[in-house]
Amino acid sequence: MATGEAIGCFGLTEADRGSDPGSMRTSAKRDGGDWGLNGSKMWITNGSASQVAVIWAQTDEGIGGFVVPTSTPGFSAPVIKHKLSLRASVTSELVMDNLRLPGDAVLPEVRGLKGPLSCLNEARFGSTWSGETRVGMPWLPH
């Protein structure tokens, strides 16, 4: 993703849970040296266009982030159609159904709410500037 060779998405929001990491139901369980992920994420920008997803899930040690290639068996990203807004980008549900990942797919040293909340805080800057730009554009000299 850093080189622009892959599109990624950020899987935190859940249906009926919003972006509240403390109430998420998506789970990741250790199975030997691997991880098993189950659950779903909702309203994910670029979900079906991504080659990589960062999925946040409850583990026995707290919330963890997982790097998931979207070609992994058990992963699907159905497109959400007929949205009322945010039509400039594709929005998807991310579904993990008995998805298996190697042990090193977990983001190292990221445990608890700090991981997903720090990402959300950074994203808020982009959202703010996007709105400010739209409001200010008519008054900028062309």
Specify the residue positions occupied by each region the protein language model found.
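A short core secondary-structure module
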Residues: 40-77
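A structural signal for short hydrophobic beta-strand segments in well-ordered beta-sheet cores
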Residues: 26-28
